[in-house]
């Protein structure tokens, strides 16, 4: 997974053994290196914690550190909790690209015809044969040329000459990293299974065959498992740890269907702890609500029938989970419940949260940590190409912005609260645990080109990292625990040389509202003259920070 040289490409695959619980799956990236390292003896680690800042590339981590007063221009950096970990590397994130009958390659295609929506049910594309050559294409979705499907390869690849040997050294083609960029489903699949696949894939290979995830491997070895996220629990990154479906938007389905993420999480994989967003009371509204009108519900991430089963039977439901949801004093209730549950007795915890107007996510933290943007549309800034974000919340009659924010903060835990609760439950397992914690809203802020929200969500994620590091120090230390902090993919953010000074002078909120890229000190995309020229991912290597028992094999 480490980028050590640009002179030669090779594949590095880790063997799935008992020791895989240490490796976590993150070490199975296709890498750039010019030498082989000797085999490293693998020893058993009790607890493995993987923390993913969704979309948190090198520039985003640097912006977060700068907001705390630390300025650097290369390397690991300092100022954030995850930057205190002993080890640092870079990992590529690309996936596959496949052309169907029309000959146009796309990163979103499997090797099946997709004539049947059920995972794995469609026939294979006629004449398809996997070709391992690199094929970045010339469009964001991949391909773009009418070519014979077997004329070029099915791996996107990464060229350090075009993209840069590292994130702080630009390559010679600023458009290149837009081409065939990965999505969170594809990259999460690789993180959890060690297999490259296509955008949209939730732990299935290019033939839509299910892959064994590290969560399942850990469970098979008697360990408790957990999924924690600031976005919906059946979104791509958490979903790929505990489901196998061909499309990431298969969030939930009515019982007893299983070709969806949430039902597989709850009925097949059954992690000990599932905590995150996706509550139906988070539907966005473009205007305040009149007297007598109930807050909008949006059953996108959970069906009405699934929610009814859980909410009406929080302690005894068909899924055998203790169910918590957003409500008064949510963080306190979560902590109290977590303290009572014991995985050795078969207890499991499911918590579903989300702020009104946040499209399923927890209250969003701004750079100063005041959650002042809670309830505002997450996708307003980039969509308006540089104008100020939306200022309208789905207020109830008589509710003010101040009381709205206070209510949402009270009725929803933070990512840090969720992490503490997960550790409280999982740490009771005498055999140890595997836990994934995702700062998913970092990615949402970056899609919006919203610097203020992006820095805030990075710092929010870092609080959870600090909590985890402190927990490790007090629970067996680094001799019993392994912590890996990384991103699943990057975004196309560039900080100008004057960014640090402008950030100190004007603050992130002002730089977010500024439409001129020079005055804003940053821009999104390949054109330095356009501040909001891109609102999507980039095919750049991402940082990996890690420390603990078993880290030598990474």
For each feature predicted by the language model, list its residue ranges.
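Anion (oxyanion) recognition and catalysis
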Residues: 219
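Hydrophobic alpha-helical membrane-insertion segments, chiefly the h-region
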Residues: 23-32
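Glycine-rich anion/phosphate-binding loops
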Residues: 204-212, 255
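Ser/Thr/Pro/Gly-rich low-complexity linker/stalk segments immediately outside membranes or between
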Residues: 34-44
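N-terminal Sec-pathway targeting helices
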Residues: 7-20
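General structural concept
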Residues: 199-207, 227
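A post-motif C-terminal structural segment
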Residues: 42-48, 53-182, 187-189, 230, ...
């Amino acid at each position: 997974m480490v980028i050590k040289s640009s002179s030669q490409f090779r594949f590095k695959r880790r063997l799935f053994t008992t020791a895989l619980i240490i490796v976590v799956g993150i070490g199975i990236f296709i890498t750039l290196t010019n030498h082989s390292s000797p085999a490293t003896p693998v020893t058993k680690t009790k607890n493995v914690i993987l923390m993913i800042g969704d979309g948190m590339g090198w520039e985003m981590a640097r912006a977060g550190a700068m907001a705390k007063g630390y300025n650097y221009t290369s390397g690991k950096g300092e100022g954030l909790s995850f930057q205190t970990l002993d080890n640092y590397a870079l990992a590529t994130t690309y996936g596959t690209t496949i052309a169907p009958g029309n000959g146009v390659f796309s990163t979103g295609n499997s090797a099946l015809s997709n004539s049947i929506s059920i995972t794995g049910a469609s026939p294979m594309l006629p004449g398809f044969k996997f070709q391992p050559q690199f094929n970045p294409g010339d469009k964001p979705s991949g391909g773009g040329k009418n070519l014979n499907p077997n004329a070029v390869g099915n791996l996107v690849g990464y060229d350090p000459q075009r993209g840069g040997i590292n994130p702080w050294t630009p390559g010679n083609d600023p458009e290149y990293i837009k081409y065939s960029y990965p999505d969170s489903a594809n990259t999460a699949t690789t993180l959890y299974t060690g297999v490259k696949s296509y955008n949209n894939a939730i732990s299935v290979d290019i033939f839509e065959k299910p892959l064994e995830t590290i969560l399942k491997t850990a469970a098979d070895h008697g360990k408790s498992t957990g999924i924690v996220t600031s976005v919906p629990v059946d979104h791509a990154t958490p979903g790929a740890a505990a489901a196998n479906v061909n499309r990431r938007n298969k969030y939930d389905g009515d019982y007893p269907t299983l070709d969806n993420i949430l039902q597989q999480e709850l009925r097949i994989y059954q992690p000990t702890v599932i905590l995150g967003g996706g509550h139906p009371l988070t539907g966005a509204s473009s205007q305040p609500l009149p007297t007598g009108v109930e807050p909008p519900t949006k059953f996108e991430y959970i069906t009405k029938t699934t929610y009814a089963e859980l909410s009406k039977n929080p302690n005894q439901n068909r899924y055998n989970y203790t169910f918590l949801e957003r409500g008064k004093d949510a963080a306190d209730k979560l902590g109290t419940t977590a303290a009572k549950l014991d995985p050795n007795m078969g207890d499991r915890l499911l918590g579903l949260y989300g702020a009104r107007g946040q499209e399923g996510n927890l209250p969003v933290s701004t750079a100063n940590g005041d959650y002042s943007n809670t309830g505002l549309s997450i996708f307003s800034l980039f969509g308006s190409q540089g104008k100020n974000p939306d200022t309208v919340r789905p207020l109830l009659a008589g509710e003010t912005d101040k009381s709205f924010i206070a209510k949402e903060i009270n009725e929803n835990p933070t990512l840090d609260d969720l992490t503490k609760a997960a550790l409280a439950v999982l740490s009771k397992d005498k055999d140890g645990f595997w836990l994934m914690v995702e700062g998913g809203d970092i990615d949402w802020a970056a899609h919006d080109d919203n610097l203020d929200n992006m820095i805030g969500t990075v710092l929010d994620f870092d609080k959870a990292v600090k909590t985890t590091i402190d927990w490790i120090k007090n629970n067996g230390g680094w001799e019993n625990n392994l912590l890996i902090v990384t991103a699943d993919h990057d975004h196309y953010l560039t900080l100008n040389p004057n960014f640090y000074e402008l950030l100190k002078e004007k603050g992130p909120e002002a730089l977010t509202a500024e439409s001129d890229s020079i005055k804003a000190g940053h821009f999104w995309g390949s054109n330095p003259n356009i501040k909001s020229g891109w609102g999507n991912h980039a095919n750049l290597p991402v940082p990996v920070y890690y420390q603990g028992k078993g880290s030598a094999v990474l």
